[in-house]
């Protein structure tokens, strides 16, 4: 099996079973407000469906100088996000042969940023040959809320291969002061948790009202399971999401807007409900695979069910011509994923707002 890495020396891994996967762990030296320098370690790790672990074949690139490094943990097998790929016709690979092109996606988190890796390999029965694996370079820090006519652009190191990927944002820092809009994070909104169709919402000015209704209903169905109030559709929040979606390049790479709202992103999905389901399933299909009350993991799931968030606006850009499906942006007001402790209760905002399924 051959594996190559953008901006990294190509590594040859021989004799691996079809059950093994190559893990990529990114190491970065960070300067706030600037793009981080990147070094990448490629290893062969745990199996996915059985077989022996490949422990001998390792290729490592030069790492940043000590003191400037934030090292992410190599993902466990359960942390691999693998895109569902339909049956494919034989495709000519880089060597001129015919194989079934299969795309894999997995992620890791560095400095609170979710880094997405995707790669294509060609299946010839027992043999799997890896093609290019693309890596994002994200910008850490810097930037405030963009004005109406100036929205940030996506900055990445390379184009990725078509797959379904997602990313989410968090706000504040540990023990940070919470903005006024979220200072009463533990207080329920005036609405009740019904999970029913949100037919009373005003979708005036929305490009695709069917998409808006579908993704709002999908959110509220999940929130009802956790006993938290329904979200309502908000025109201002929607306009923000739509403007940010409109500037997307359909590259397959994801970067957050850096604005004042909570934000979940996804690309490669057929519709909004599918993207929402992927976000929610970070806690398992039933929402039970999460350490409620003790976890410090902020992700798409926690923003979806965040109790004190009351308003939603979601939009998309059609990237099907680039084989990327829909690029989905959901903005949340007030923002969820607030880090720190509520001074009134002494509890973490996470514990107050991410509740167990009922």
Swiss-Prot record:
SMART domains: SCP (SM00198). Residues 48-98, 144-203 are annotated as: Disordered. Pfam families: CAP. Residues 48-63, 153-174, 189-200 have a biased composition (Low complexity). Keywords: Secreted, Signal, Virulence. One of its GO terms (biological process) is sexual reproduction. The keyword Cell division does not apply. Induction: Induced during the switch from the yeast form to filamentous growth and by fluconazole. Expression is negatively regulated by CPH2, EFG1, RFG1, and TUP1. Belongs to the CRISP family. This is Secreted protein RBT4. The lineage of its organism: Eukaryota, Fungi, Dikarya, Ascomycota, Saccharomycotina.
């Amino acid at each position: 099996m051959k594996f190559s890495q953008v901006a990294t020396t190509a590594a040859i891994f021989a004799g691996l079973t079809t059950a093994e996967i190559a893990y990529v762990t990114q190491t970065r030296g960070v300067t706030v407000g600037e793009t981080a320098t990147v070094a990448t370690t490629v290893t062969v790790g745990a199996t996915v469906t059985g077989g022996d672990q490949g422990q001998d074949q390792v290729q490592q690139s030069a790492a940043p100088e000590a003191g400037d490094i934030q090292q992410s943990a190599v993902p466990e097998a359960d942390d691999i996000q693998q895109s569902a790929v339909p049956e494919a016709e034989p495709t000519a690979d880089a060597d001129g042969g015919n194989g079934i092109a299969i795309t894999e996606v997995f992620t890791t988190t560095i400095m609170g940023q979710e880094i997405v890796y995707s790669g294509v390999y060609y299946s010839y029965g027992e043999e799997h040959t890896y093609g290019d694996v693309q890596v994002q370079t994200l910008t850490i820090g810097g930037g405030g809320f963009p004005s109406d006519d100036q929205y940030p652009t996506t900055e990445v190191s390379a184009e990725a291969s078509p797959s379904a990927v997602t990313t989410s944002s968090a706000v504040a820092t540990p023990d940070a002061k919470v903005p006024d809009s979220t200072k009463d994070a533990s207080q329920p909104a005036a609405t009740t948790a019904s999970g029913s169709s949100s037919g009373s919402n005003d979708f005036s000015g929305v490009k695709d009202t069917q998409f808006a209704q579908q993704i709002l209903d999908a959110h509220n169905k999940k929130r009802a399971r956790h006993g938290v109030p329904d979200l309502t559709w908000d025109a201002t929040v929607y306009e923000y999401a739509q403007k940010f979606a409109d500037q997307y390049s359909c590259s397959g790479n994801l970067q957050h807007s850096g604005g004042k709202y909570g934000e979940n992103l996804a690309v490669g999905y057929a519709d909004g409900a599918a993207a929402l389901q992927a976000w929610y399933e970070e806690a398992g299909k039933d929402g039970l695979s999460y350490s409620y009350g003790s976890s410090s993991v902020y992700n798409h799931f926690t923003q979806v069910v965040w109790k004190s968030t009351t308003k939603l606006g979601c939009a998309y850009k059609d990237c099907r011509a680039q084989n990327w499906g829909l690029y989905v942006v959901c903005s949340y007001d007030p923002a969820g994923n607030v880090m720190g402790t509520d001074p009134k209760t002494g509890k973490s905002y996470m514990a107050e707002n991410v509740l167990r399924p009922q």
